[in-house]
Amino acid sequence: MRDEKGAVNRRKFVKIAAFAPAAFKLTSSPALSQDTAPIAGQSGSQWNSSGWLFDRFELTLDRVLHGDSPAYTEEFVLADVRPSAERRFTEYSGDVSGRYIGALATAARVYGTDVPDLDALVAKVIVLQKPDGYFGSTFHYEKPTDADMALLWGNGRLLVGLLEYYELRKSAPVLASCRRIGDFLVRVAPMMLSTEIREAFGAQHFASSYICWTQQIEGLANLYRVTNDIPYRRLAEDIARVIERRAGDHVHGYLTSLRGVMGLYEATGDAQWLRQCEAAWEDITSSQDLLMTGGVPEGWSPNNHRTEGCGEADWVRLNLALWRATTEQKYLAMAERAIFNELAFNQYETGDFGHRLYTETGLPAAGAVRAWWCCTLHGLRCFPDIQESVFHTKDGALHYDLPLDGRIKVPALSVFAESSFAHDGSIRIMIEEAGNTASLLRMRKPPWAKQIEVSVNGSPVELHETNGYVSLERRWSAGDAVKLKYGMERLTTRVADDRVAFSHGPWLLGAAAADNPAYFNELTPQNKLLSESLSDVRTVRRPAQPFSVPIAATTFRYAQAEYPDQPAKVELRAIAEQTGEPTTSWELRFLTSWT
Protein backbone atom coordinates (compact mmCIF):
# COMPACT_ATOMS: atom_id res chain seq x y z
CA MET A 1 0.00 0.00 0.00
CA ARG A 2 2.96 2.33 0.44
CA ASP A 3 5.91 3.02 -1.82
CA GLU A 4 9.52 2.80 -0.71
CA LYS A 5 9.35 6.30 0.78
CA GLY A 6 6.31 5.46 2.89
CA ALA A 7 3.85 7.58 0.94
CA VAL A 8 0.38 6.30 0.27
CA ASN A 9 0.08 4.81 -3.21
CA ARG A 10 -3.44 6.00 -3.93
CA ARG A 11 -3.90 4.02 -7.09
CA LYS A 12 -3.32 0.75 -5.24
CA PHE A 13 -4.91 1.74 -1.96
CA VAL A 14 -8.57 2.25 -2.82
CA LYS A 15 -10.54 1.32 -5.91
CA ILE A 16 -14.01 2.55 -6.53
CA ALA A 17 -16.96 1.05 -8.32
CA ALA A 18 -18.99 3.77 -9.94
CA PHE A 19 -21.90 3.28 -7.58
CA ALA A 20 -22.40 -0.25 -8.77
CA PRO A 21 -22.15 -2.88 -6.00
CA ALA A 22 -18.60 -3.02 -4.67
CA ALA A 23 -16.28 -5.08 -6.82
CA PHE A 24 -14.55 -6.58 -3.81
CA LYS A 25 -15.51 -9.54 -1.67
CA LEU A 26 -15.08 -9.10 2.04
CA THR A 27 -13.51 -12.12 3.69
CA SER A 28 -16.42 -14.26 4.86
CA SER A 29 -16.68 -15.55 8.40
CA PRO A 30 -18.65 -18.73 9.21
CA ALA A 31 -20.53 -16.88 11.94
CA LEU A 32 -21.90 -14.51 9.33
CA SER A 33 -22.49 -16.93 6.50
CA GLN A 34 -26.22 -17.45 7.05
CA ASP A 35 -28.25 -15.60 4.41
CA THR A 36 -25.15 -13.64 3.45
CA ALA A 37 -24.61 -13.05 -0.23
CA PRO A 38 -21.09 -12.22 -1.39
CA ILE A 39 -20.45 -8.66 -2.43
CA ALA A 40 -19.86 -8.75 -6.15
CA GLY A 41 -20.41 -6.64 -9.18
CA GLN A 42 -18.86 -5.41 -12.37
CA SER A 43 -15.34 -4.10 -12.28
CA GLY A 44 -15.56 -0.44 -11.45
CA SER A 45 -13.55 2.38 -12.90
CA GLN A 46 -10.78 3.93 -10.84
CA TRP A 47 -11.92 6.81 -8.68
CA ASN A 48 -10.43 10.19 -9.48
CA SER A 49 -7.46 10.23 -7.11
CA SER A 50 -6.76 13.96 -7.09
CA GLY A 51 -10.05 15.36 -5.82
CA TRP A 52 -10.23 17.52 -2.70
CA LEU A 53 -13.00 15.45 -1.11
CA PHE A 54 -11.67 12.04 -2.04
CA ASP A 55 -8.14 12.89 -0.93
CA ARG A 56 -9.47 13.91 2.48
CA PHE A 57 -11.50 10.71 2.73
CA GLU A 58 -8.47 8.68 1.72
CA LEU A 59 -6.24 10.43 4.26
CA THR A 60 -8.51 9.43 7.15
CA LEU A 61 -9.20 5.98 5.72
CA ASP A 62 -5.46 5.31 5.50
CA ARG A 63 -5.00 6.55 9.06
CA VAL A 64 -7.71 4.17 10.35
CA LEU A 65 -6.52 1.13 8.40
CA HIS A 66 -2.75 1.62 8.57
CA GLY A 67 -1.97 4.41 11.03
CA ASP A 68 -0.57 4.27 14.53
CA SER A 69 -0.59 6.27 17.77
CA PRO A 70 -2.80 4.36 18.27
CA ALA A 71 -3.24 1.59 15.74
CA TYR A 72 -6.78 0.26 15.38
CA THR A 73 -5.78 -3.37 15.86
CA GLU A 74 -8.39 -6.06 16.36
CA GLU A 75 -7.61 -6.30 20.07
CA PHE A 76 -7.74 -2.53 20.40
CA VAL A 77 -11.16 -2.30 18.76
CA LEU A 78 -12.62 -5.24 20.68
CA ALA A 79 -11.52 -3.85 24.06
CA ASP A 80 -14.77 -1.95 24.62
CA VAL A 81 -17.06 -4.94 24.08
CA ARG A 82 -15.15 -7.38 26.26
CA PRO A 83 -14.50 -4.98 28.08
CA SER A 84 -10.82 -4.73 29.01
CA ALA A 85 -8.74 -1.84 30.28
CA GLU A 86 -6.40 -1.79 27.30
CA ARG A 87 -7.14 1.84 26.48
CA ARG A 88 -9.20 4.89 27.47
CA PHE A 89 -12.97 4.92 27.43
CA THR A 90 -13.69 1.20 27.28
CA GLU A 91 -16.58 1.91 29.68
CA TYR A 92 -18.32 3.34 26.59
CA SER A 93 -18.99 -0.24 25.56
CA GLY A 94 -19.26 -0.48 21.79
CA ASP A 95 -18.29 3.12 21.03
CA VAL A 96 -15.00 2.61 19.18
CA SER A 97 -16.01 -0.80 17.84
CA GLY A 98 -19.38 0.45 16.59
CA ARG A 99 -17.95 3.54 14.93
CA TYR A 100 -15.16 1.50 13.36
CA ILE A 101 -17.56 -1.07 11.93
CA GLY A 102 -20.05 1.52 10.71
CA ALA A 103 -17.48 3.82 9.12
CA LEU A 104 -15.74 1.04 7.21
CA ALA A 105 -18.95 -0.70 6.18
CA THR A 106 -20.31 2.57 4.80
CA ALA A 107 -17.01 3.27 3.02
CA ALA A 108 -17.27 -0.17 1.41
CA ARG A 109 -20.87 0.45 0.37
CA VAL A 110 -20.41 3.97 -1.02
CA TYR A 111 -16.81 4.01 -2.22
CA GLY A 112 -16.24 0.31 -2.86
CA THR A 113 -13.39 0.25 -0.37
CA ASP A 114 -11.75 -3.13 0.17
CA VAL A 115 -11.90 -3.97 3.90
CA PRO A 116 -11.00 -7.68 3.99
CA ASP A 117 -10.96 -8.16 7.78
CA LEU A 118 -14.29 -6.55 8.62
CA ASP A 119 -16.39 -9.72 8.52
CA ALA A 120 -14.15 -11.52 10.97
CA LEU A 121 -14.17 -8.56 13.34
CA VAL A 122 -17.96 -8.31 13.32
CA ALA A 123 -18.23 -12.03 14.05
CA LYS A 124 -15.97 -11.62 17.07
CA VAL A 125 -18.01 -8.67 18.31
CA ILE A 126 -21.45 -10.25 18.24
CA VAL A 127 -20.41 -13.37 20.17
CA LEU A 128 -19.55 -11.08 23.11
CA GLN A 129 -23.16 -9.94 23.54
CA LYS A 130 -24.56 -10.47 27.05
CA PRO A 131 -27.69 -12.61 27.56
CA ASP A 132 -29.68 -9.45 28.33
CA GLY A 133 -28.79 -8.07 24.89
CA TYR A 134 -26.22 -5.42 25.75
CA PHE A 135 -22.43 -5.36 25.44
CA GLY A 136 -19.87 -4.45 28.08
CA SER A 137 -19.85 -4.52 31.88
CA THR A 138 -22.82 -5.18 34.12
CA PHE A 139 -25.73 -2.78 33.67
CA HIS A 140 -27.32 -1.66 36.95
CA TYR A 141 -31.06 -1.79 36.40
CA GLU A 142 -31.95 -0.62 39.90
CA LYS A 143 -30.04 2.66 39.96
CA PRO A 144 -28.01 3.59 36.88
CA THR A 145 -24.76 5.51 37.36
CA ASP A 146 -22.52 7.46 34.99
CA ALA A 147 -20.87 4.16 34.07
CA ASP A 148 -24.25 2.79 33.00
CA MET A 149 -24.92 5.87 30.90
CA ALA A 150 -21.53 5.34 29.25
CA LEU A 151 -22.48 1.73 28.54
CA LEU A 152 -25.74 2.91 26.98
CA TRP A 153 -23.88 5.40 24.81
CA GLY A 154 -21.49 2.76 23.50
CA ASN A 155 -24.26 0.25 22.83
CA GLY A 156 -26.11 2.91 20.85
CA ARG A 157 -23.08 3.52 18.66
CA LEU A 158 -22.61 -0.22 18.22
CA LEU A 159 -26.25 -0.70 17.20
CA VAL A 160 -25.81 1.94 14.51
CA GLY A 161 -22.52 0.44 13.33
CA LEU A 162 -23.91 -3.08 13.11
CA LEU A 163 -26.94 -1.86 11.16
CA GLU A 164 -24.65 -0.02 8.74
CA TYR A 165 -22.77 -3.28 8.33
CA TYR A 166 -26.10 -5.04 7.77
CA GLU A 167 -26.89 -2.54 5.01
CA LEU A 168 -23.71 -3.74 3.32
CA ARG A 169 -24.15 -7.46 4.02
CA LYS A 170 -27.56 -8.88 4.83
CA SER A 171 -26.35 -11.10 7.66
CA ALA A 172 -29.02 -12.82 9.76
CA PRO A 173 -26.71 -13.21 12.80
CA VAL A 174 -25.92 -9.51 12.74
CA LEU A 175 -29.58 -8.53 12.49
CA ALA A 176 -30.39 -10.88 15.36
CA SER A 177 -27.73 -9.17 17.46
CA CYS A 178 -29.23 -5.78 16.58
CA ARG A 179 -32.67 -6.98 17.63
CA ARG A 180 -31.29 -8.09 20.99
CA ILE A 181 -29.83 -4.62 21.58
CA GLY A 182 -33.17 -3.11 20.57
CA ASP A 183 -35.06 -5.42 22.91
CA PHE A 184 -32.74 -4.46 25.77
CA LEU A 185 -33.47 -0.78 25.08
CA VAL A 186 -37.22 -1.46 25.04
CA ARG A 187 -36.85 -3.25 28.38
CA VAL A 188 -35.08 -0.34 30.12
CA ALA A 189 -37.17 2.35 28.41
CA PRO A 190 -39.71 2.96 31.20
CA MET A 191 -36.92 3.74 33.63
CA MET A 192 -34.81 5.72 31.16
CA LEU A 193 -37.75 7.84 30.01
CA SER A 194 -38.69 8.75 33.57
CA THR A 195 -38.45 12.31 34.85
CA GLU A 196 -36.19 11.06 37.64
CA ILE A 197 -33.51 9.83 35.23
CA ARG A 198 -33.83 12.85 32.95
CA GLU A 199 -33.20 15.18 35.87
CA ALA A 200 -30.51 13.03 37.47
CA PHE A 201 -28.28 13.09 34.39
CA GLY A 202 -28.24 16.75 33.49
CA ALA A 203 -25.73 18.71 31.44
CA GLN A 204 -23.19 18.66 34.28
CA HIS A 205 -22.62 14.97 33.46
CA PHE A 206 -21.70 16.03 29.89
CA ALA A 207 -20.49 12.91 27.99
CA SER A 208 -22.45 10.71 30.41
CA SER A 209 -25.52 12.94 30.54
CA TYR A 210 -29.03 12.12 29.33
CA ILE A 211 -27.84 12.37 25.73
CA CYS A 212 -26.44 8.84 26.23
CA TRP A 213 -30.08 7.73 26.19
CA THR A 214 -31.55 10.09 23.60
CA GLN A 215 -28.94 9.15 20.99
CA GLN A 216 -30.43 5.64 20.97
CA ILE A 217 -33.03 7.03 18.59
CA GLU A 218 -30.64 6.76 15.64
CA GLY A 219 -30.20 3.02 16.02
CA LEU A 220 -33.85 2.43 16.88
CA ALA A 221 -35.08 4.34 13.82
CA ASN A 222 -32.71 2.35 11.61
CA LEU A 223 -33.78 -0.89 13.28
CA TYR A 224 -37.43 -0.08 12.65
CA ARG A 225 -36.67 0.73 9.01
CA VAL A 226 -35.07 -2.70 8.59
CA THR A 227 -37.53 -4.80 10.61
CA ASN A 228 -40.83 -2.84 10.66
CA ASP A 229 -41.18 -3.91 14.29
CA ILE A 230 -43.53 -1.44 15.99
CA PRO A 231 -41.92 -1.49 19.48
CA TYR A 232 -38.73 0.02 18.03
CA ARG A 233 -40.70 2.76 16.30
CA ARG A 234 -42.73 3.55 19.40
CA LEU A 235 -39.62 3.81 21.56
CA ALA A 236 -37.91 6.03 18.98
CA GLU A 237 -40.95 8.31 19.00
CA ASP A 238 -40.99 8.41 22.80
CA ILE A 239 -37.32 9.39 22.83
CA ALA A 240 -37.87 12.07 20.19
CA ARG A 241 -40.38 13.76 22.49
CA VAL A 242 -37.85 14.19 25.33
CA ILE A 243 -34.90 15.50 23.31
CA GLU A 244 -33.90 19.00 24.37
CA ARG A 245 -30.92 21.32 23.94
CA ARG A 246 -29.70 21.87 27.48
CA ALA A 247 -27.31 24.70 28.31
CA GLY A 248 -23.76 23.40 28.68
CA ASP A 249 -24.61 19.92 27.40
CA HIS A 250 -22.76 17.72 24.94
CA VAL A 251 -23.27 18.90 21.34
CA HIS A 252 -22.33 15.61 19.68
CA GLY A 253 -24.92 13.75 21.75
CA TYR A 254 -27.64 16.27 20.96
CA LEU A 255 -26.91 16.41 17.23
CA THR A 256 -26.69 12.63 17.02
CA SER A 257 -30.13 12.53 18.63
CA LEU A 258 -31.45 14.98 16.02
CA ARG A 259 -29.98 12.89 13.23
CA GLY A 260 -31.92 10.02 14.76
CA VAL A 261 -35.10 12.11 14.58
CA MET A 262 -34.36 12.68 10.89
CA GLY A 263 -33.91 8.93 10.53
CA LEU A 264 -37.30 8.45 12.18
CA TYR A 265 -38.83 10.86 9.67
CA GLU A 266 -37.20 9.01 6.78
CA ALA A 267 -38.45 5.66 8.12
CA THR A 268 -42.03 6.75 8.83
CA GLY A 269 -42.76 9.78 6.64
CA ASP A 270 -44.30 11.49 9.69
CA ALA A 271 -43.71 15.21 9.10
CA GLN A 272 -43.75 16.11 12.80
CA TRP A 273 -40.23 14.71 13.14
CA LEU A 274 -38.98 16.79 10.23
CA ARG A 275 -40.56 19.88 11.78
CA GLN A 276 -38.82 19.09 15.07
CA CYS A 277 -35.43 19.05 13.35
CA GLU A 278 -36.16 22.22 11.39
CA ALA A 279 -37.08 24.03 14.61
CA ALA A 280 -33.92 22.75 16.30
CA TRP A 281 -31.86 23.99 13.33
CA GLU A 282 -33.37 27.46 13.64
CA ASP A 283 -32.61 27.45 17.36
CA ILE A 284 -28.95 26.53 16.79
CA THR A 285 -28.30 28.88 13.88
CA SER A 286 -29.80 31.85 15.71
CA SER A 287 -27.67 31.22 18.80
CA GLN A 288 -24.13 32.20 19.71
CA ASP A 289 -23.16 28.54 19.33
CA LEU A 290 -23.00 28.73 15.54
CA LEU A 291 -19.31 29.41 14.95
CA MET A 292 -17.92 31.64 12.22
CA THR A 293 -16.29 28.56 10.70
CA GLY A 294 -19.75 27.13 10.05
CA GLY A 295 -19.28 24.60 12.83
CA VAL A 296 -20.45 24.13 16.39
CA PRO A 297 -18.69 23.84 19.76
CA GLU A 298 -18.17 20.69 21.80
CA GLY A 299 -20.52 22.00 24.49
CA TRP A 300 -23.45 24.38 24.26
CA SER A 301 -23.08 27.77 25.91
CA PRO A 302 -21.79 28.54 28.45
CA ASN A 303 -19.56 25.47 28.04
CA ASN A 304 -18.42 26.51 24.58
CA HIS A 305 -14.64 26.81 24.61
CA ARG A 306 -13.49 24.21 22.06
CA THR A 307 -14.69 22.21 19.09
CA GLU A 308 -15.06 18.46 18.58
CA GLY A 309 -14.76 16.62 15.29
CA CYS A 310 -17.75 14.41 16.13
CA GLY A 311 -20.02 17.42 16.51
CA GLU A 312 -18.73 18.95 13.28
CA ALA A 313 -19.42 15.72 11.39
CA ASP A 314 -22.89 15.52 12.95
CA TRP A 315 -23.65 19.12 11.98
CA VAL A 316 -22.65 18.48 8.36
CA ARG A 317 -24.68 15.28 8.22
CA LEU A 318 -27.75 16.87 9.85
CA ASN A 319 -27.70 19.73 7.35
CA LEU A 320 -27.32 17.32 4.45
CA ALA A 321 -30.23 15.23 5.75
CA LEU A 322 -32.41 18.34 6.03
CA TRP A 323 -31.36 19.34 2.52
CA ARG A 324 -32.33 15.94 1.11
CA ALA A 325 -35.69 16.06 2.89
CA THR A 326 -36.64 19.62 1.92
CA THR A 327 -34.30 20.82 -0.89
CA GLU A 328 -34.16 24.14 0.96
CA GLN A 329 -30.94 25.88 -0.02
CA LYS A 330 -30.19 27.18 3.48
CA TYR A 331 -29.39 23.67 4.67
CA LEU A 332 -27.09 22.94 1.74
CA ALA A 333 -25.35 26.31 2.16
CA MET A 334 -24.75 25.61 5.85
CA ALA A 335 -23.37 22.15 5.12
CA GLU A 336 -21.11 23.62 2.43
CA ARG A 337 -19.78 26.27 4.79
CA ALA A 338 -18.97 23.67 7.44
CA ILE A 339 -17.39 21.24 4.96
CA PHE A 340 -15.03 23.79 3.43
CA ASN A 341 -14.06 25.35 6.75
CA GLU A 342 -14.74 23.75 10.14
CA LEU A 343 -14.65 20.11 9.05
CA ALA A 344 -11.61 20.67 6.85
CA PHE A 345 -9.78 22.64 9.55
CA ASN A 346 -10.58 19.95 12.13
CA GLN A 347 -8.89 17.23 10.06
CA TYR A 348 -5.28 16.79 11.17
CA GLU A 349 -2.41 16.08 8.80
CA THR A 350 -2.42 12.54 10.24
CA GLY A 351 -6.02 12.05 9.06
CA ASP A 352 -7.37 12.21 12.61
CA PHE A 353 -10.16 14.51 13.74
CA GLY A 354 -10.40 15.98 17.21
CA HIS A 355 -10.51 19.14 19.29
CA ARG A 356 -9.36 22.74 18.85
CA LEU A 357 -9.68 25.51 21.39
CA TYR A 358 -10.95 28.86 20.18
CA THR A 359 -10.72 32.41 21.46
CA GLU A 360 -12.55 35.62 20.61
CA THR A 361 -10.21 36.16 17.65
CA GLY A 362 -8.77 32.83 16.58
CA LEU A 363 -7.79 29.21 16.98
CA PRO A 364 -4.60 28.68 19.01
CA ALA A 365 -2.41 25.63 18.48
CA ALA A 366 -2.30 25.01 22.22
CA GLY A 367 -4.93 22.53 23.33
CA ALA A 368 -5.23 20.70 20.00
CA VAL A 369 -6.21 17.06 20.60
CA ARG A 370 -6.46 14.14 18.17
CA ALA A 371 -9.54 12.35 19.50
CA TRP A 372 -8.86 8.86 18.14
CA TRP A 373 -11.51 7.38 20.48
CA CYS A 374 -14.41 8.99 18.59
CA CYS A 375 -13.72 11.89 16.23
CA THR A 376 -11.37 10.13 13.81
CA LEU A 377 -13.90 7.39 13.15
CA HIS A 378 -16.91 9.71 13.14
CA GLY A 379 -15.06 11.99 10.72
CA LEU A 380 -14.43 9.05 8.41
CA ARG A 381 -18.13 8.19 8.54
CA CYS A 382 -19.02 11.71 7.41
CA PHE A 383 -17.32 11.49 4.01
CA PRO A 384 -19.79 9.06 2.38
CA ASP A 385 -22.68 11.36 3.31
CA ILE A 386 -20.90 14.28 1.64
CA GLN A 387 -20.08 12.17 -1.41
CA GLU A 388 -23.72 11.14 -1.78
CA SER A 389 -24.73 14.82 -1.67
CA VAL A 390 -22.45 16.12 -4.43
CA PHE A 391 -25.10 15.18 -7.02
CA HIS A 392 -28.80 14.42 -6.74
CA THR A 393 -31.63 13.67 -9.14
CA LYS A 394 -35.07 15.24 -9.11
CA ASP A 395 -37.88 15.41 -11.67
CA GLY A 396 -35.73 13.69 -14.26
CA ALA A 397 -32.87 16.19 -13.96
CA LEU A 398 -29.38 15.58 -12.65
CA HIS A 399 -28.29 18.28 -10.19
CA TYR A 400 -24.70 19.16 -9.33
CA ASP A 401 -24.96 20.71 -5.87
CA LEU A 402 -21.56 20.95 -4.15
CA PRO A 403 -18.36 22.13 -5.90
CA LEU A 404 -16.52 18.92 -5.06
CA ASP A 405 -15.27 15.83 -6.80
CA GLY A 406 -17.92 13.13 -6.93
CA ARG A 407 -19.64 10.50 -8.99
CA ILE A 408 -23.16 9.31 -9.72
CA LYS A 409 -24.77 6.77 -11.99
CA VAL A 410 -28.46 7.00 -12.90
CA PRO A 411 -30.37 5.35 -15.75
CA ALA A 412 -29.87 8.23 -18.18
CA LEU A 413 -26.34 9.30 -17.26
CA SER A 414 -23.15 8.21 -15.58
CA VAL A 415 -20.99 11.20 -14.67
CA PHE A 416 -18.14 12.21 -12.45
CA ALA A 417 -16.84 15.59 -11.35
CA GLU A 418 -13.15 16.31 -10.97
CA SER A 419 -11.96 19.40 -9.21
CA SER A 420 -9.21 21.97 -9.56
CA PHE A 421 -11.46 24.34 -7.65
CA ALA A 422 -8.88 25.28 -5.02
CA HIS A 423 -6.37 26.23 -7.69
CA ASP A 424 -8.32 27.96 -10.46
CA GLY A 425 -11.96 27.91 -9.36
CA SER A 426 -13.02 25.29 -11.87
CA ILE A 427 -14.80 21.94 -11.91
CA ARG A 428 -15.00 19.55 -14.85
CA ILE A 429 -18.02 17.24 -15.14
CA MET A 430 -17.29 14.27 -17.38
CA ILE A 431 -19.96 12.17 -19.06
CA GLU A 432 -19.01 8.48 -18.84
CA GLU A 433 -22.21 6.93 -20.16
CA ALA A 434 -25.30 8.48 -21.73
CA GLY A 435 -28.68 7.34 -22.98
CA ASN A 436 -30.28 7.95 -26.35
CA THR A 437 -32.44 10.88 -25.29
CA ALA A 438 -31.76 14.40 -24.07
CA SER A 439 -31.00 14.82 -20.36
CA LEU A 440 -31.08 17.91 -18.19
CA LEU A 441 -28.03 18.86 -16.12
CA ARG A 442 -28.60 21.56 -13.50
CA MET A 443 -25.60 23.17 -11.79
CA ARG A 444 -25.98 25.11 -8.56
CA LYS A 445 -24.75 28.68 -8.32
CA PRO A 446 -23.79 29.11 -4.64
CA PRO A 447 -24.44 32.44 -2.90
CA TRP A 448 -20.69 33.18 -2.76
CA ALA A 449 -20.27 32.89 -6.56
CA LYS A 450 -20.67 36.04 -8.66
CA GLN A 451 -21.32 33.93 -11.73
CA ILE A 452 -20.62 30.55 -13.29
CA GLU A 453 -19.04 30.35 -16.71
CA VAL A 454 -19.95 27.12 -18.50
CA SER A 455 -18.34 25.48 -21.51
CA VAL A 456 -19.07 22.17 -23.21
CA ASN A 457 -16.20 20.39 -24.92
CA GLY A 458 -14.26 23.66 -24.86
CA SER A 459 -17.01 25.85 -26.33
CA PRO A 460 -18.61 28.50 -24.06
CA VAL A 461 -22.36 28.38 -23.59
CA GLU A 462 -24.51 31.15 -22.19
CA LEU A 463 -26.90 30.00 -19.49
CA HIS A 464 -29.35 31.83 -17.26
CA GLU A 465 -29.83 31.27 -13.57
CA THR A 466 -33.19 30.01 -12.33
CA ASN A 467 -33.83 29.30 -8.65
CA GLY A 468 -30.13 29.14 -7.89
CA TYR A 469 -29.19 26.82 -10.76
CA VAL A 470 -28.03 27.13 -14.35
CA SER A 471 -29.36 24.41 -16.65
CA LEU A 472 -28.08 22.64 -19.71
CA GLU A 473 -30.19 20.15 -21.68
CA ARG A 474 -28.87 18.16 -24.59
CA ARG A 475 -28.32 14.67 -25.88
CA TRP A 476 -25.10 13.73 -24.18
CA SER A 477 -22.37 11.41 -25.43
CA ALA A 478 -19.72 9.51 -23.54
CA GLY A 479 -16.63 11.70 -23.32
CA ASP A 480 -18.48 15.02 -23.21
CA ALA A 481 -16.89 17.47 -20.78
CA VAL A 482 -18.68 20.32 -19.02
CA LYS A 483 -16.36 22.86 -17.42
CA LEU A 484 -17.64 25.17 -14.68
CA LYS A 485 -15.67 28.26 -13.74
CA TYR A 486 -16.87 29.91 -10.54
CA GLY A 487 -16.41 33.66 -10.30
CA MET A 488 -15.23 34.45 -6.78
CA GLU A 489 -13.89 37.43 -4.91
CA ARG A 490 -12.67 38.23 -1.44
CA LEU A 491 -15.47 39.27 0.90
CA THR A 492 -15.21 41.25 4.12
CA THR A 493 -17.73 40.52 6.86
CA ARG A 494 -18.14 42.47 10.08
CA VAL A 495 -18.11 39.89 12.89
CA ALA A 496 -17.96 42.25 15.88
CA ASP A 497 -18.25 45.96 16.55
CA ASP A 498 -14.62 46.53 15.66
CA ARG A 499 -13.51 43.39 13.83
CA VAL A 500 -13.90 41.81 10.41
CA ALA A 501 -13.37 38.41 8.85
CA PHE A 502 -12.35 37.61 5.29
CA SER A 503 -13.47 34.88 2.93
CA HIS A 504 -12.85 33.91 -0.67
CA GLY A 505 -15.63 31.90 -2.23
CA PRO A 506 -16.56 29.23 0.33
CA TRP A 507 -13.25 29.50 2.19
CA LEU A 508 -12.75 31.39 5.45
CA LEU A 509 -9.33 33.06 5.56
CA GLY A 510 -6.93 33.38 8.46
CA ALA A 511 -3.38 34.34 9.37
CA ALA A 512 -1.33 31.28 10.31
CA ALA A 513 1.59 31.40 12.73
CA ALA A 514 3.46 28.86 10.61
CA ASP A 515 4.15 31.41 7.87
CA ASN A 516 3.56 34.67 9.77
CA PRO A 517 5.63 34.16 12.95
CA ALA A 518 6.23 37.88 13.49
CA TYR A 519 2.48 38.53 13.47
CA PHE A 520 2.03 36.41 16.61
CA ASN A 521 3.15 37.70 19.98
CA GLU A 522 1.66 38.79 23.29
CA LEU A 523 -0.61 41.46 21.74
CA THR A 524 -1.55 39.54 18.59
CA PRO A 525 -5.30 40.36 18.73
CA GLN A 526 -4.47 44.08 18.71
CA ASN A 527 -2.57 43.99 15.42
CA LYS A 528 -4.30 46.12 12.79
CA LEU A 529 -4.54 45.61 9.05
CA LEU A 530 -3.70 48.93 7.39
CA SER A 531 -5.20 48.85 3.93
CA GLU A 532 -6.88 46.75 1.33
CA SER A 533 -4.82 43.79 0.22
CA LEU A 534 -1.50 44.32 -1.49
CA SER A 535 -1.67 41.15 -3.51
CA ASP A 536 -3.95 38.24 -4.27
CA VAL A 537 -1.04 35.88 -4.83
CA ARG A 538 0.87 33.79 -2.37
CA THR A 539 3.80 35.76 -0.93
CA VAL A 540 5.15 33.28 1.60
CA ARG A 541 7.37 30.65 0.02
CA ARG A 542 6.67 27.16 1.32
CA PRO A 543 7.08 23.66 -0.02
CA ALA A 544 4.17 22.31 -2.01
CA GLN A 545 1.70 20.78 0.42
CA PRO A 546 -1.54 18.86 0.08
CA PHE A 547 -4.88 20.61 0.55
CA SER A 548 -3.53 24.03 -0.36
CA VAL A 549 -5.96 26.66 -1.68
CA PRO A 550 -3.75 29.06 -3.64
CA ILE A 551 -6.71 30.80 -5.27
CA ALA A 552 -7.75 32.23 -1.89
CA ALA A 553 -4.40 33.56 -0.63
CA THR A 554 -4.08 37.31 -0.11
CA THR A 555 -1.59 39.66 1.56
CA PHE A 556 -2.13 42.74 3.74
CA ARG A 557 0.06 45.33 5.36
CA TYR A 558 -0.45 45.56 9.10
CA ALA A 559 0.72 47.47 12.14
CA GLN A 560 2.17 45.28 14.89
CA ALA A 561 0.44 46.31 18.11
CA GLU A 562 3.74 46.21 20.00
CA TYR A 563 5.67 48.45 17.54
CA PRO A 564 3.12 50.05 15.19
CA ASP A 565 5.65 52.37 13.55
CA GLN A 566 7.21 49.38 11.76
CA PRO A 567 4.47 48.03 9.46
CA ALA A 568 4.92 44.60 7.92
CA LYS A 569 3.10 42.12 5.70
CA VAL A 570 0.82 39.24 6.68
CA GLU A 571 -0.58 36.56 4.41
CA LEU A 572 -4.10 35.28 4.84
CA ARG A 573 -5.02 31.88 3.46
CA ALA A 574 -7.82 29.34 3.72
CA ILE A 575 -7.98 27.76 7.17
CA ALA A 576 -8.78 24.50 5.35
CA GLU A 577 -5.06 24.34 4.56
CA GLN A 578 -4.41 23.34 8.18
CA THR A 579 -4.82 19.68 7.19
CA GLY A 580 -1.68 19.81 5.06
CA GLU A 581 0.72 20.90 7.81
CA PRO A 582 1.55 20.48 11.51
CA THR A 583 -0.88 22.16 13.90
CA THR A 584 -0.39 25.92 14.08
CA SER A 585 -2.23 28.94 15.49
CA TRP A 586 -4.63 30.99 13.36
CA GLU A 587 -6.14 34.44 13.74
CA LEU A 588 -9.56 34.89 12.10
CA ARG A 589 -11.02 38.19 13.36
CA PHE A 590 -9.06 41.32 12.54
CA LEU A 591 -8.89 44.97 13.46
CA THR A 592 -8.51 47.18 10.40
CA SER A 593 -7.79 50.80 9.68
CA TRP A 594 -10.79 51.16 7.37
CA THR A 595 -13.67 49.71 9.42
Region roles according to the model:
Residues 35-116, 145-169, 210-231, 235, ...:
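Aromatic (Trp/Tyr) and acidic
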Residues 449-474, 492-495:
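Solvent-exposed beta-strand/loop surfaces of large extracellular or lumenal domains
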Residues 1-16, 21:
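N-terminal secretory signal peptides
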Residues 441-442, 472-487:
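C-terminal beta-strand-rich structural cap/linker in extracellular carbohydrate-active enzymes
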Residues 142-149, 181-207:
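Asp-box/WD-like beta-propeller blade repeats and closely related beta-sheet repeat scaffolds
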Residues 118-129:
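Carboxylate/His-rich catalytic cores and anion/metal-binding grooves
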Residues 236, 277, 332-430, 465, ...:
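C-terminal beta-rich recognition modules with glycine/proline-rich loops and embedded aromatic residues
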Residues 31-33:
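Boundary at the C-terminal end of the N-terminal hydrophobic targeting segment
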